[in-house]
Swiss-Prot record:
The gene is dnaK. InterPro entries: ATPase_NBD, Chaperone_DnaK, Heat_shock_70_CS, HSP70_C_sf, HSP70_peptide-bd_sf, Hsp_70_fam. It comes from the Archaea. Pfam families: HSP70. HAMAP family: DnaK. Belongs to the heat shock protein 70 family. Residues 622-641 have a biased composition (Acidic residues). Residues 493-511 have a biased composition (Basic and acidic residues). Residues 488-527, 585-641 are annotated as: Disordered. It comes from Haloquadratum walsbyi (strain DSM 16790 / HBSQ001). This is Chaperone protein DnaK. Gene3D superfamilies: 1.20.1270.10, 3.30.420.40, Actin, Chain A, domain 4, Substrate Binding Domain Of DNAk, Chain A, domain 1. GO terms for molecular function: ATP binding; ATP-dependent protein folding chaperone; unfolded protein binding.
Length: 641
C-alpha cells in the first residue's frame, strides 16, 4: 500500500541522506546498511552485479574502472556518459540508481511504498541541472513534487521551532558544490533574499590537493608517478579523504600505504606525515574561492555582515577547522553548531514534503532563481527578462521586434547567466517562431514570456501579436530527455530492479541448498548406525544431485529449489526413522526396568535430541525466511503604438 508520506532526499555528490516527517518532526531514515548517510557511489562487478552505496564504495580500490563517484558534478552535461558493464549511462541514469536504493531502503524502513519525493539541489544549479535531477527522480520511480535548494532546505531544518524574526546565512560546502544563501526568517516564512555559489568547488577538491601532494612527494623520492596507475590513484584518493577527516580533529596524521607499487627491486611503500598546517596551506586557494560568492550574496541581499543574526554550516566539508575559522573571520559571527551538516538538508526536504502533503502548517517557502534568464538579441547581446534572485514562481514578459525587413521567422535562444554576451552564458535551449507576416524591420511585435515554476524549471513562449502564432519550450535536462526517454529509462531501471531481485532469490536458494547438504553430511556422519543402508544411499544420491546443480553456474533458482526440496524430504525421512527407533528403544527400556522413575526423563532427553534433528532436517524454508532572427527590444513608447 502506498504511503501519503513524501520523502525528503539530499542527493549529494559524495553522500546522500533521506528523511520523512514522523509526527511533528523530520526523521532521518537509516539505510539497509544501518547508516544515516549513503555513499553516492555506483559500481558494476565482474559478474555484472550492480552495487550502490556502501558496498560500491568498499570495493572501489579493487574495481576503480567500474566504479562511479561524484556523478552529481556532471548533472545536466550534454553528451556526457559513463561506462558500466559495457553500457553507457547518463548522469541522470546513474543518479537514478542511487535514488532507487534510497527508495527501496525507505520503503523497507517505513513498511510502505513511497511514491513522492522532494529532492534538493545546489542553489546555484542552473535549469538544465535542475531538470536533470528531476528526470533522475522520475527514472527511479518517484513523482518529484518539488526541487528545493539545499541551503533553503537546511534553513527550514534550523528554523522549524524558532518563531523569531532573523536573518541567516547558510554556507553550504559539500563534496562537489558550494552555495551560500541569505534568508529572512519569521512567522513561518522562509524568504531567500539572495544566493550565490560555485558548482565546481567542494570537498573533492580538498582531496585532490592532498592527492597531488602525495603523488608529488612519492615521485620526488622514487621517480614514479602514481597518478598513472588507476588502482594506486584510488588508494591515494581514499587515503586523502581519510586524512582530511582526521585533520578536522587532530593536528597531524600519518598516511601509510604499503605496496603502493613495485619496481624491479621489489615492492615500494608510501608513508607521509601530513600536518593540519600543511593541509591548510595546500588548500588555502580553495577556501579563498568561497569568499567571493559569500560577499556577493551579501551585496545582492543589500546586507552587511553585521545584519546576519546566525550562520549555518551545511555539508560535511564544513567540519574542517579552516572553513569554520574563515566563515567566522568573514562574517564576524560564530557558526551554529547545533545543526548536523550531513543531515540538515535532508531534514529540511522532509519538512517541505510535509508542507506539500498537508502535514506541516504555517510554513511558507519563498525561494529564488540563482541566475538571470533571458534571450539573445541583435549583436549577440544577452537581454534579461528575469533577474537573478527573483522570488519564484514568477513570470515576466517583454516585447521584441525584428531587425531585418520581411523577416518571417525568428530564432529564440534562451540563456541563463550573468554575462552581457549571450554566448558566454549557459545556452538552455532554442526554438523557432515562424509564420510572421512580412513587414518592414521593427514593425512586428513579438512577446516573449518566461515562466519559472516552484521547482525553478523554465518555460519560454514567443507569440507574434499580429498573427497570433506562438511557440514555446520547456527547458529539458542535460540529455534533453523527452517523456518517452524518461519512460524508457524507468523501464530499464525497473528491469534492473527485477534482475537484482532474481539474483537475490537465486543466492538465497543456493544458500539453502548448501545448508541442506551440510545438514545431511552431519546427520550421516553422526548417526551412521541408526540409518538403514537404503536410506543412506538415497540421501547420498540426493546430496550428489544438489552438489551437481550448485556447480552449474547457469542453474536457475527453480532447479536449485527442486533438488533442495528432494534432499529435505529425505532428511525428514531420517528424522522419522530415528524417531521410531528412539520410541522403540524407550519402550523396550520401560519393559525391562518396569515403570522406573528414571525412564521418563531419559526418554524425554532423547526425544529432545530428536526434535532438534527433525527441526534441522526441515529448516530449508526457515532459512529462506531469514534469509537569428536577430531581435530588437521594443521600447515602451513603441509598445503602446
Amino acid at each position: 500500500m502506498a504511503s501519503n508520506k513524501i520523502l525528503g532526499i539530499d542527493l549529494g555528490t559524495t553522500n546522500s541522506a533521506f528523511a520523512v516527517m514522523e509526527g511533528d518532526d523530520p526523521e532521518i531514515i537509516v539505510n539497509a546498511e544501518g547508516d544515516r548517510t549513503t555513499p553516492s557511489v555506483v559500481a558494476m562487478t565482474d559478474d555484472e552485479e550492480r552495487l550502490v552505496g556502501k558496498p560500491a564504495k568498499n570495493q572501489v580500490i579493487q574495481n576503480p574502472d567500474q566504479t562511479i563517484r561524484s556523478i552529481k558534478r556532471h548533472m545536466g552535461e550534454e553528451d556526457y556518459t559513463v561506462e558500466l558493464g559495457g553500457e553507457d549511462y547518463t548522469p541522470e541514469q546513474v543518479s537514478a540508481m542511487i535514488l532507487q536504493k534510497i527508495k527501496r531502503d525507505a520503503e523497507e524502513y517505513l513498511g510502505d511504498e513511497i511514491e513522492k519525493a522532494v529532492i534538493t539541489v545546489p542553489a546555484y544549479f542552473n535549469d538544465r541541472q535542475r531538470q536533470a535531477t528531476k528526470d533522475a527522480g522520475e527514472i527511479a520511480g518517484f513523482e518529484v513534487d518539488r526541487i528545493v535548494n539545499e541551503p533553503t532546505a537546511a534553513s527550514m531544518a534550523y528554523g522549524l521551532d524558532d518563531e523569531s524574526n532573523q536573518t541567516i546565512l547558510v554556507y553550504d560546502l559539500g563534496g562537489g558544490t558550494f552555495d551560500v544563501s541569505v534568508l529572512d526568517l519569521g512567522g513561518g516564512v522562509y524568504e531567500v533574499v539572495a544566493t550565490n555559489g560555485d558548482n565546481d568547488l567542494g570537498g573533492d577538491d580538498w582531496d585532490d590537493a592532498v592527492i597531488d601532494w602525495l603523488a608529488g612527494e612519492f615521485e620526488d623520492n622514487h621517480g614514479i608517478d602514481l597518478r598513472d596507475d588507476r588502482q594506486a590513484l584510488q588508494r591515494l584518493k581514499d587515503a586523502a579523504e581519510e586524512a582530511k577527516i582526521e585533520l578536522s580533529s587532530r593536528k597531524e596524521t600519518t598516511i601509510n600505504l604499503p605496496f603502493i607499487t613495485a619496481t624491479d627491486s621489489g615492492p615500494v611503500h608510501l608513508e607521509e606525515t601530513l600536518s593540519r598546517a600543511k593541509f591548510e596551506s595546500l588548500t588555502e586557494d580553495l577556501i579563498e574561492r568561497t569568499v567571493g560568492p559569500t560577499e556577493q550574496a551579501l551585496e545582492d541581499a543589500g546586507y552587511d555582515d553585521s545584519d546576519i543574526d546566525e550562520v549555518i554550516l551545511v555539508g560535511g566539508s564544513t567540519r574542517m577547522p579552516q572553513v569554520r575559522e574563515k566563515v567566522e573571520d568573514l562574517l564576524g559571527t560564530e557558526p551554529k553548531k547545533n545543526v548536523n551538516p550531513d543531515e540538515a538538508v535532508a531534514l529540511g526536504a522532509a519538512i517541505q514534503g510535509g508542507v506539500l502533503a498537508g502535514d506541516v502548517d504555517d510554513i511558507v517557502l519563498l525561494d529564488v532563481t540563482p541566475l538571470s534568464l533571458g534571450i539573445e538579441v541583435k549583436g549577440g547581446l544577452f537581454e534579461r527578462l528575469i533577474d537573478k534572485n527573483t522570488t519564484i514562481p514568477t513570470e515576466e514578459s517583454k516585447v521584441f521586434t525584428t531587425a531585418a525587413a520581411n523577416q518571417t521567422s525568428v530564432n529564440v535562444r534562451v540563456f541563463q547567466g550573468e554575462r552581457e554576451i549571450a554566448e558566454e552564458n549557459e545556452l538552455l535551449g532554442e526554438f523557432q517562431l515562424a509564420g510572421i507576416p512580412p513587414a518592414p524591420a521593427g514593425t512586428p511585435q513579438i512577446e516573449v514570456t518566461f515562466n519559472i515554476d516552484e521547482n525553478g524549471i523554465v518555460n519560454v513562449e514567443a507569440e507574434d501579436q499580429g498573427s497570433g502564432n506562438a511557440e514555446s519550450i520547456t527547458i529539458e535536462g542535460g540529455a534533453g530527455l523527452s517523456d518517452e526517454e524518461i519512460e524508457q529509462m524507468q523501464e530499464e531501471a525497473e528491469a534492473h530492479a527485477e534482475e537484482d531481485e532474481r539474483r537475490r532469490e537465486r543466492i538465497e536458494a543456493r544458500n539453502s541448498a548448501e545448508s541442506a547438504v551440510q545438514r545431511a553430511e552431519t546427520l550421516l556422519e553422526e548417526n551412521e548406525e541408526d540409518i538403514d543402508d537404503d536410506l543412506k544411499e538415497s540421501i547420498e544420491d540426493e546430496v550428489e544431485s544438489v552438489e551437481a546443480v550448485l556447480e552449474d553456474e547457469d542453474a536457475t533458482k527453480e532447479e536449485i529449489e527442486d533438488v533442495t526440496e528432494s534432499l529435505s524430504s529425505e532428511l525428514q525421512e531420517i528424522g522419522k526413522q530415528m524417531y521410531d527407533a528412539q520410541q522403540a528403544a524407550a519402550g523396550a527400556g520401560a519393559g525391562a526396568a518396569g515403570a522406573g522413575a528414571g525412564a521418563g526423563p531419559g526418554g524425554m532427553g532423547d526425544m529432545g535430541d530428536m526434535g532438534d534433528m527433525g527441526g534441522a532436517a526441515g529448516s530449508g524454508d526457515a532459512d529462506n525466511e531469514y534469509v537569428d532572427a536577430d531581435f530588437e527590444d521594443v521600447d515602451d513608447d513603441t509598445k503602446d503604438e
